Amino acid sequence: MEANKKAKPSYGDVISNLPNDLLCRILSYLSTKEAALTSILSKRWSNLLLSIPILDFDDSVLLKPQKGQRKNVFFKAFVDRLLSQRVETSSHVQRVSLKCRQGGVEPDCVIKWILTTVRDLGVLDLSLCIDFGIFHLPFNVFRSKTLVKLRIGTMIRLSQFPSDVVSPTLNSLVLDLVEFRDGDKVEFRQILLAFPSLQSLRVHESNKWKFWNGSASSRTLKSLVYRSDDDSSAPKPCVSFDTPSLVYLDYSDMVADKYENLKFDSLVEARLDLHLTAFQIMRKPNNIGIVSGDVTTLFKGIRNVKILCLSPDALEALYYRGEKIPMFNNLITLSLGSDKPHGSPFIFWKLLPSLLNNSLKLETLIIKGLVHYVAEGWEGLSPMTPMSRLCFSWDTVSDSLSSSAMKVLEISGYKGTWQELNQMKRFLGNLSRLEVVRVYHKAMDDKERINVMFDLFLLPKVSSECDIQVMKETA
C-alpha cells in the first residue's frame, strides 16, 4: 500500500515543471487579463507575464461595471503598468492587439500606448480596433522599421499622409473603415509607395469611410481584398489593377464605368461580387434589362485563373453588362452563388452552359445557395442583351460536356424538386468523368434523405465511377 502511494504521480506539479518558453507559449493563447491572473501564483509566474510574446488588450473584457457605469480606470492602469514594465525589461513583444470600443479612455492615452508598442517595444504585428467615435491616428506608426503586419479599424481617421513615410518591413496591411483627416486627397498609389514590401492588402469601405479612387498599382502585392458597402454613391469612372504579382483577388464593389490596364500575370484565384446600380440597369416588367457599359474587359483580365468564385450579383453583372464570356483555359474550380438567399435563377441557368463550355479543364463545380431550376415561363423570355444572344443552350454544349474533365459536383440548398432533378439529369447524363456528387439538403430527416438519394440514384449516369453523396446542410 505504501509503495502504491509513492508510485502515484503528482499531477499538481506537471505544469510548474514545464520550461518557461513553453509556459509563455501557453499563456499566449489566453487573453492578457487571464494571463495576468497567473502572476499571483508565484514570482516565477509574475516574471512570465513579462515574457509573453503576445499582448491582447480588450476594454470590453477588462472594464468592470460599478453602479451602472463602466470603470475605465482599471483598464488604463493595467495597460500603462504592463507596457511600462515591458519597456523597462526590454522584453520582446511579437504581437499586440488593442481593442477600445467602450469609450472613456482619452485619445492621447491610446496614442501613447500605440507609439510605445511600435517605437519602444519594436512589435512585429499590431492590430488596432478603436470604435468609440472618430479617432485620429498619427502617421508615425508607419515609420516603424520593425512592423510587419498592421491592421487598422474601425472608424479611425488618419492624419495627413506625408510623402516621406516609408515602412520597408511592412508586408501585410488591413484598412477597415478608415478615413483621411480633413478630407485630404490621398491616392491609393501613395499608400502603396509607402510600403515597398507590401504583399497583402485588405480594404473595407462604406459610403462615408472611403478613399480608393479605383486605381491600384504594385509590383509586390500578392493578395488584395477590397470590399465596399457603399450602394448609394455613383460608380467609379474607371478601375485598373496594375498588379503583375497578384495571386489572390477578392473584389466586391459597384460595377465601374470601365475597366482598363489590368495586369494579372500571376493571378491564381479570383472572387468577384459586382453590384449594379439602379442607373446601370433598368428592368422591364418581364425582368429583362437594358444597360450601358461593359464588364467583359474585367473577365478577360482574369481568364487565366485556376479558381473562380462568382456571386449572384456578379453573374447578373456579367449577363447585363457583358458582351462575351472568355475562354478560361486554366480554370479548375468554379464556384457560383453565395450563402445569401438572392440571385436570379434565370440568369444563372442562362450563363452556366457557356461557362462550362468555355472551361475545358474544369474539375470542380460548386453551386451555392441559388435556386437550381428555372421557374415556369422564364425559358421563353426574349433576349434583349448582347450576352443573352451569345449564351449557349444546354443542347448546344452537350457534346463539350461529355468530354468535360469535371470530376466533382457540389450543390447546396437542394430541395429535391422535379425541376432540380431535371438539371441533375443533365449533369449526370453528360459528364462522363464525374466521380463525386455532393448534395446538401437543408431540412433533412432520415426519410427525406432516403427519398432524395433514391430519386438521384434512379437518374441515368454516363460515369460508372460516380458516387452520389447526400448530406444535411449545417449552415
From Swiss-Prot:
Name of one Pfam family that matches: F-box
Alphabetical list of InterPro entries matching this protein: F-box-like_dom_sf (IPR036047), F-box_AtFBL13-like (IPR053781), F-box_dom (IPR001810), FBD (IPR006566), FBL60-like (IPR055294)
Domain F-box stretches: 12-58
Disulfide bonds: none
This protein's name: F-box protein At3g59150
Lineage of producing organism: Eukaryota, Viridiplantae, Streptophyta, Embryophyta, Tracheophyta
